[in-house]
Amino acid sequence: MSGGPYFDDLAVGQVFDSAPAVTLTAGMAAVHQAIVGDRLRLPLDADLSAAVTGAPAALAHPGLVWDVAIGQTTLATQRVKANLFYRGLVFHRFPVIGDTLYTRTEVVGLRANRPKPGRAPTGLTALRMTTIDQADRLVLDFYRCAMLPASPGWPPDEERAGDDLSGVGADAAAPAHDPTADWDAEAFRRRVPGPHFDAGLAGTVLHSSADVVSSAPELARLTLNIAATHHDSRISGRRLVYGGHTIGLALAQATRMLPNLVTVLGWQSCDHTGPVYEGDTLYSELHVESACPVDNGGALGLRSLVYAVSDSGPDRQVLDWRFTALQF
């Protein structure tokens, strides 16, 4: 389908699984790190990664993994106008460099937006995305909601708005086993200076320095993201930055404020509260909502509120992201 499906071309149960598989390489990892600037230690330090995880290759950055997975799903949302939220993203396995990712995308809900005078009709599409590796091992299983335009001339049915999408992702399954259970926390602590996990972090609010958004289309291309709004300014008058780019910068800022984060275990919620454009300057306010000891360290419940600097008015909030990170 040239240009991708419109909202009314989709049906619940429809599957998109023909995106190219992607082998994670050191080159991809380097380009990704150059764009988002993340400082997670294990993806950057192959020796440390081997000592902690026991894997034969360096751990792939979790942001690279979810960016590739999301990019593979854009066959269904090439015409997307906005991506509203993600739900239930949790790592069932942490890939390493050399692993190959395959993603299956299924339409699980459709809801037409209420018609507005002077605006073309649109609808919300809820998608379930399942990512496996070359050995059919589950990596990710999560949901997102995208707003798509309806086809020209499509008459919205005001009698039947569609599915209730409020519960999308609420029943996302937890991993069958902890993918970090065999990681060596003591090896990390021996090699990396403190501070390490401290339950007293709960309640802390940290404020980041800022980052300019650059190389936005390059990140989209790197991760197979073909949503036209990230590449073609004619779609909405200005290219919209891929939401994962904003998330990537938020995580990079978190790693500067908490330099001994080990990895991201999963997301509780992720809402794009405003648009981001190339050249915007973003900063974040990081709330440590919880700090819970686990067998090999601690799990930090984090909330990142990201803002875009404005020259002419109040700074705009653009992201509200709750996630859980592992700290040793």
State where each predicted segment sits.
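Hydrophobic beta-strand core residues of beta-sandwich domains
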Residues: 7-10, 23-24, 59, 89, ...
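Non-catalytic linker/capping segments at the edges of enzyme domains
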Residues: 1-52, 149-237, 297, 324
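Hydrophobic beta-strand-centered segment that forms part of the acyl-chain substrate-binding groove
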Residues: 50-111, 245-289
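A beta-strand-loop signature enriched in Asp, Gly, Thr, and Trp
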Residues: 236-240, 265-267
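HotDog/MaoC-like acyl-thioester-processing domains
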Residues: 2-12, 97-180, 278, 287-328
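Structural beta-strand/beta-sheet cores of well-ordered domains, especially the beta-sheet scaffolds
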Residues: 20, 87, 125-127, 204, ...
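Intrinsically disordered, low-complexity coil segments
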Residues: 45-56, 115-119
